[in-house]
Amino acid sequence: MQSNKVHMGHTARKRFGQNFLHDRYVIDQIVAAINPQPGQNLVEIGPGLAALTEPVASQMDKMTVVELDRDLAARLREHPTLKEKLTVIEADAMRFDFGTLMGEGKGPLRIFGNLPYNISTPLIFHLCEFADRVEDMHFMLQKEVVLRLAAGPGSKAYGRLSVMTQYYCQVVPVLEVGPGAFKPAPKVDSAVVRLIPHKNPTIVAKDIRCLNRVCTEGFGQRRKTIRNSFSNFITDAQLTELGIDGNLRPENLSLEQFVMIANWLADQQQA
């Protein structure tokens, strides 16, 4: 009897967080959401056994895939219907410079993939660094992560991931997916999300490192009031000057308020 970790002759590798999508209905729904068009600059992260690659590539002349697993990268290079269309980059997406895919005459990046759940959060942070060169991103993620991405102030799911992602992108949940759509089946529900980078952001952080610090320090102690969690860099009186109540908890602050505090901090560091 074949192991449930084996799909199309490939054994899923736990260290790569591999769960292969095989449900045709779900695949069709994702491809429809991506809506690939000839001439666009499409990039897939972790194509695996090409469940999404094949239907997307059928509508494209060329596309790029970034695959860490050398066995899967080799399969893609020899794939009978894909090898002429694909540029296969054997690399770790967490360290890859996606800006190198913006060659002469190429449009903004459209990135998609069934992301390994064990690296999805840091990978999204990495991809946000390229937001000014990205048209949109479509990812299959753990449902809980999609809820965190889309969460607003006042909810338990709202945190650093929500604020930092929403600073760069509009977050649009697209589709919920059960474990049975994958082989091997994960122990959690999944969901597809669309991330659309803001073209003309109305909220601008002077130093993104300051915004990251404010989010990290705030949500690292989310039961504390911001008067206490931010006490090592801003006083209660200074928060009041910004029009922010020091009795609030971090989860009650809006994106605009986080950026306001971060910009105040950036100004202090420049002074």
Curated annotation (Swiss-Prot):
Enzyme class: transferase
Top-level lineage group: Bacteria
Disulphides: none
Residues annotated to bind S-adenosyl-L-methionine: 19, 21, 46, 67, 92, 114
Record field: catalytic activity: adenosine(1518)/adenosine(1519) in 16S rRNA + 4 S-adenosyl-L-methionine = N(6)-dimethyladenosine(1518)/N(6)-dimethyladenosine(1519) in 16S rRNA + 4 S-adenosyl-L-homocysteine + 4 H(+)
Keyword terms of this UniProt record: Cytoplasm, Methyltransferase, RNA-binding, rRNA processing, S-adenosyl-L-methionine, Transferase
HAMAP family: 16SrRNA_methyltr_A (MF_00607)
Family statement drawn from the similarity comment of this UniProt entry: Belongs to the class I-like SAM-binding methyltransferase superfamily. rRNA adenine N(6)-methyltransferase family. RsmA subfamily.
Protein name: Ribosomal RNA small subunit methyltransferase A
Biological source species: Aeromonas hydrophila subsp. hydrophila (strain ATCC 7966 / DSM 30187 / BCRC 13018 / CCUG 14551 / JCM 1027 / KCTC 2358 / NCIMB 9240 / NCTC 8049)
